[in-house]
Amino acid sequence: MASKPGPLSRWPWQDLGNYKETQLIMVDERRRRRTRNGCFLHCMLSYALVAPWAVRSTYRFVRSGSGERDLLAFAVLPVLLLRLLYSQLWITVSRHQTARSRHRIVNKSLDFEQVDRERNWDDQILLTALLFYAVNAAVPVAQSVPWWDSRGLLVAALLHVGPVEFLYYWLHRALHHHYLYARYHSHHHASIVTEPITSVIHPFAEELVYFTLFAIPLLTMVGTGTASVAVANGYLAYIDFMNYLGHCNFELVPRLLFDVFPPLKYLMYTPSFHSLHHTQFRSNYSLFMPLYDHLYGTADKSSDDLYERALQGRAGEDAPDVVHLTHLTTPASLLRLRLGFASLAAAPAPPASRYGAGSSSSSSSSLAAVACPLAALLGWTRTAFRSEANRLHKLKLETWVVPRYTSQYLSKQGLYAVGRVVEKAVADAEASGARVLTLGLLNQANELNKNGELYVIRKPSMRTKIVDGTSLAAAAVLHMIPEGTDEVLLLGDAGGNKMAGVLASALCEREIQVHVVDKDLYESVKQQLRPETHEHLLHLAEWWSHSAKTTKVWLVGDRLTGEEQRRAQGGAHFVPYSQFPPGAVVRADCVYHSTPALVVPDAFEDLHACENWLPRRVMSAWRAAGIVHALEGWDAHECGARVTGVDKAWRAALAHGFRPYDRYGAN
């Protein structure tokens, strides 16, 4: 909201909500699931406002004869859906460009607060549909407009260049008067780093005034009998395009356009021109045409220079210091990336175990239905793509996503193909000049690349350091174990479980008894211990032994079945040491801890998307390990059998501002 919200600042349906998930982070998974379902219901309620009009217009269109159909009303619903899709495409393209492009204009941090403030970007599309339906019902002549009338195109163009642009310019200057600015326009200007949807983030009263201006050409066309469905909706498309262009925060308007037609400089603004309005505030007030800024002397003198610099791009911006290589978990996770739905990316995803999907709520099912066609197209892609770019002090950090899903990593048939994509991503990271590469989720699976060691074996001279993050992840697990614990139960698989070995070794060094039920895991872990610590590692022959029943701390791997959970005594702590949540929660009297993670330093910039199921500004320990590696300047790999050192990694992480994180609660 504005700093001092004025009358009619709230949108009428604000309490119903829009297509958004909650930003609240619940510790109780059952409450999290109910909250997500509630937000999905809110989405349905807000868009249900359009439903009666849409049903009525469709019914009338079908029942009417070919010469009596109300084309304008019938087109409202498909145009609404197309505008939603078009807006989302702009969000995706803009975020992709600002993560990788040298042509980014404002190089400042975008945070979760801005994402929350701009969650209602679809309100203006919903309002447009409602107003179109209302005017169509109130003005009979609007019910008989044709598909096309070229005269309306001329009317719309002249009225936009004249009254609309002129009135908007002076209205905009008035909104920068301290009285109106504090009550209305400051809400829009709270976003210094703009995104395409920033263009439509205004209080309701301010948006109504803008709609009144944009209605001048539309109502004039209706009144003069020159209106048509194509021109009316084409005018909306023009407004959307110019709005999103001006706020996309990367320069894409080619110089050739202005060289071929120099007057275009006064008829079309550029992203860099409007960005100055958001950084300087007292210049570049024009809507889409800088003509009036030049006429009244408010054009920023640095506009041309900024345009040239943004078009040329920043030298050296392409080389990241640290690349984190992750992958998709499910098709729906595609929409939860930073490049997907902004509000979903800013909220933790439902926990998904390695061996199955997470939530089965109606909202998750709907997301999966939307994502499946996109997932099918993405299956043809054989290159990892940039999803996120962050900064910490002087480090440039990037997150790359392998376009493959957890199920494909677990499939013997698909593992070879996945391996080729991951290996190419590793080669691309080195070619980009990255100093450190971290392997997230199953990108470091033993059966895929032996915790990254395969790439070092194939290229011993590799300059980029491969970091699997085992040391820091083990340290994070140790921090979650309650103080005073003298024994733990270690569960997991034996197959290449480096994490279990490092963790057990650290526990035995601290003289904590480690009980292992699985014989193969016991033998695997024992080989990684110093002989003098073997006495602290015990093999339990049976699940129902006294030690298994009474141990209060369970260290669990990728899978924790309901049957296993029921064997624990009340009050037991389940502490995952895997990158994936181990499974569904079935005990109400036990404590379930987070997967190993750290809270990022306050200086960490441009973080506005959650990492999978972790909450805001929390990062998996494996990802954080690479950043610490680069900050410390360590010139060694941590992959395969190589280990940085648990205590060494933990001390370094804390020294650089990372903080322990442990989300847990009794269910």
Predicted regions and their residues:
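Non-catalytic, topology-defining segments of multipass membrane proteins
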Residues: 1-186, 190-224, 286-289, 293-391, ...
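Histidine-centered catalytic micro-motifs
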Residues: 167-194, 199, 239, 243-252, ...
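Hydrophobic transmembrane alpha-helices
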Residues: 201-268, 290-293
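Extended, charged/polar low-complexity intrinsically disordered regions
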Residues: 354-422, 426, 430, 436-437, ...
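Adenosine-phosphate binding glycine-rich loop
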Residues: 382-385, 389, 393-396, 403, ...
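Phosphate/diphosphate ligand-binding glycine-rich loop within oxidoreductases
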Residues: 419-473
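Glycine-rich phosphate/diphosphate-binding loop of Rossmann-like nucleotide-binding domains
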Residues: 482-552
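Rossmann-like NAD(P)-binding element
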Residues: 516, 537-581
